[in-house]
Amino acid sequence: MTVNELKEQVLEGNFISREEAEWLAAQSDKEALYEAAHEITRTLASEEFDMCSIINAKSGRCPENCKWCAQSSHYKTKADVYDLVDKEECLRHAKYNEEQGVARFSLVTSGRKPSGKNMEKLCEAARHMRRHSSIQLCASLGLLNEEEMLALHDAGITRYHCNLETAPSYFSNLCSTHTQAEKIRTLKAARNAGMDICSGGIIGMGESMEQRIEFAFTLKDMEVQSIPINLLSPIPGTPLERQEPLNEEEILTTIALFRFINPRAFLRFAGGRSQLSTEAVRKALHIGINSAIVGDLLTTIGSKVSEDKTLIEEAGYRFSDSQFDREHLWHPYTSTTDPLPVYKVEQAEGATITLESGQTLIEGMSSWWCAIHGYNNPVLNHAATEQIGKMSHVMFGGLTHEPAIELGKLLLPLVPPSMQKIFYADSGSVAVEVALKMAVQYWYGKGKEKKNNFVTIRSGYHGDTWNAMSVCDPVTGMHSLFGSSLPIRYFAPQPRSRYDGDWDAGDSMELQNIIEQHHEELAALILEPIVQGAGGMWFYHPQYLREAARLCKQYGLLLIFDEIATGFGRTGKLFAWEHAGTEPDIMCIGKALTGGYMTLSAVLTTNEVADAISNHSPGVFMHGPTFMGNPLACAVACASVRLLTSPVYDWQGKVNRISMQLREELAPARQLPQVKDVRILGAIGVIEVTENVDMAWMQRRFVEEGIWVRPFGKLVYLMPPFIIEPEQLTKLTSGLIKIIKEML
């Protein structure tokens, strides 16, 4: 066993044992240990330094007898004693720290726990700070229960801090008025309430190195990702006032061991570090400290933010604009009070994206399925540059332009022959809105105003705008929250006959029953043909589309195909309707239409639908987006469609190669106990697991593996760019399987 071997073991994703950690602690070559810990930090931990500040919102008169603490009423110290500060004082400190670039601000109070009255005041202080500041809020208020944690979380506090302080085997030597088990229950209550947890302790209170290692493993087993490391500052009047301070080598060794044991955690410099030399602080940052509490601390002197920043930047860490992002930019499907981490992209090229840190990730999502040609494509770049020199935008009402005309000419030969009219829109969701409005206005023109409702199938997804949400699954879909407010639609069961399986004739019976009973009020049936995307990544049998088309024709419904995700080759056919050979009355396309460069969608329909709308009052289709037919987007779309359909590009060959490779390389996932299903269609690969994934954990692990994959629910899937190289795709598939194995 060597230090280097244990380092490589950690870098490969395998934890060291307690015995191995004790062996590391005993090594005389400390520099080798420090450098190994440094490499683990640089490879696995965040290079973006995390700073937190605190306000001691209530001081002194604590009934607990913690031997290290100046706040305890059991000891005579010179610690300040004051009651809870008001919310304006809290806000003043929060805003000051926000201006200094500090990411988090923590409310800290002395005592076992606040009174009910003080809890209300603290919650109001948190709400007050959230109203007037965007700094992320933490709290350390003692031993709280889950109900109290929920109140804090509702007030805007997203992280709870409760130090375990030391090893389980040593805690009773330091405190007898509460137990470490009570602290652990507090942390579990915070997690149950939806908060992150922060927990560490104080080293140098008489514990052995073996007990520090025991402590580090306790935190690892609890999966704590923010670990404050305090150095005991013996305070006159406390039982530990004469405790011999640790020497700098022992402190640095402890930090290195904590990094080996908790390789991805934020190791947070907290109290007592002022006793270290500047050189020792620099070395601690080099070894593994990648977070700090700045400013004045609870019972010891802190440090100035500016001084900390200088040392931190000298150590090679960075402060990113992502703090502004966290505080002010609202990302899709993301909490503003407790946002998932975001990774700042500096450049994208081909099938890769490069982060601010310099790390390059293989792109597995095609930027939510639209960047089929990858990034920075010279053909699309040229089209955008050329068009922007002529005209970036002009209204489409009363005017037209060559890019819109040319795009229409390119699209019509690719879609069903009956599609003869094209309506340009802004996005996929808007395209669905347009399609639904077309269907209603069609029947209005036919004198059947009561035909204004819709039928669809469960587990579908059609977008985030109002009517689009109404035809998404109302129970399991992303928009179930709005169910009571949305128009009530009719939902048939999800088809259970797999694309690659046998057709069950009973699969469409419930759809038939609904249409038979309600056809007089139904304007249309809307479906994602063959592939249900964000609703569950399910691939169903083509015969279902044929049966759906038959029912629509028999009972007088329009048939709408939402091809926004499936269009332009993703399923192995240029459009998914081709799998069944059934033509819709209205068809929505988007996403890959511009190769992922710009937002643009289109709704195509038949002359019959367009004529019925146009020949009856009000004589026009009642829709007109501001950016409809945007020339810049149309020009790029023309370039993308030409590129895709050119013989040299050979999109079918590319998609077939990706499909075959996905089938081969994802097949081993079927043997994993946590995997329910593996399914492949065209350039789509899906692994369905048995439990909902931990999004934050899995996203971070994928980034650490050098791949960009964004799972949701129980689905981990790939929709790579068509231009991805085989070795890049192998990195994606192997990374997927590796991380899914870690879910055990």
Curated annotation (Swiss-Prot):
**GO terms under biological process:** biotin biosynthetic process
Q: What class of enzyme is it?
A: transferase
- Record: residues binding pyridoxal 5'-phosphate: G428, S429, D562, P625, T626
Any one of the GO CC terms:
cytoplasm
Q: Which residues carry this modification: N6-(pyridoxal phosphate)lysine?
A: K591
Q: Where does [4Fe-4S] cluster bind?
A: C62, C66, C69
Q: Which GO terms describe its molecular function?
A: 2 iron, 2 sulfur cluster binding; 4 iron, 4 sulfur cluster binding; adenosylmethionine-8-amino-7-oxononanoate transaminase activity; biotin synthase activity; iron ion binding; pyridoxal phosphate binding
Q: What residues does (8S)-8-amino-7-oxononanoate bind to?
A: W368, Y461, K591, G624, R710
The UniProt record lists the Radical SAM core domain at: 44-270
Alphabetically sorted, this entry's keywords are: 2Fe-2S, 4Fe-4S, Aminotransferase, Biotin biosynthesis, Iron, Iron-sulfur, Metal-binding, Multifunctional enzyme, Pyridoxal phosphate, S-adenosyl-L-methionine, Transferase
Q: Where is this site: Participates in the substrate recognition with KAPA and in a stacking interaction with the adenine ring of SAM?
A: Y333
InterPro entries, alphabetically? Answer: Aldolase_TIM, Aminotrans_3, Aminotrans_3_PPA_site, BATS_dom, BioA, Biotin_synth/BioAB, Elp3/MiaA/NifB-like_rSAM, PyrdxlP-dep_Trfase
Q: Which cofactor does it need?
A: [4Fe-4S] cluster; [2Fe-2S] cluster; pyridoxal 5'-phosphate
Instruction: Give its E.C. classification number.
Output: 2.8.1.6, 2.6.1.62
Q: Which pathway does it take part in? A: Cofactor biosynthesis; biotin biosynthesis; biotin from 7,8-diaminononanoate: step 2/2; Cofactor biosynthesis; biotin biosynthesis; 7,8-diaminononanoate from 8-amino-7-oxononanoate (SAM route): step 1/1
Q: Where along the chain is [2Fe-2S] cluster bound?
A: S106, C138, C198, R268
Coiled coil feature spans: none
Q: Which reaction does it catalyse?
A: (4R,5S)-dethiobiotin + (sulfur carrier)-SH + 2 reduced [2Fe-2S]-[ferredoxin] + 2 S-adenosyl-L-methionine = (sulfur carrier)-H + biotin + 2 5'-deoxyadenosine + 2 L-methionine + 2 oxidized [2Fe-2S]-[ferredoxin]; (8S)-8-amino-7-oxononanoate + S-adenosyl-L-methionine = S-adenosyl-4-methylsulfanyl-2-oxobutanoate + (7R,8S)-7,8-diammoniononanoate
The protein's matches in SUPFAM superfamilies, at most eight in alphabetical order, are given as: PLP-dependent transferases, Radical SAM enzymes
Q: Which HAMAP family match?
A: BioA (MF_00834), BioB (MF_01694)
PANTHER family, per the entry: ADENOSYLMETHIONINE-8-AMINO-7-OXONONANOATE AMINOTRANSFERASE
Complex and partners: Homodimer.
NCBIfam families from the UniProt entry:
bioA, bioB, PRK05964.1, PRK07986.1
Q: Which family does it belong to?
A: In the N-terminal section; belongs to the radical SAM superfamily. Biotin synthase family.
Protein name (database record): Biotin biosynthesis bifunctional protein BioAB
Q: What is the lineage of its organism?
A: Bacteria, Pseudomonadati, Bacteroidota, Bacteroidia, Bacteroidales
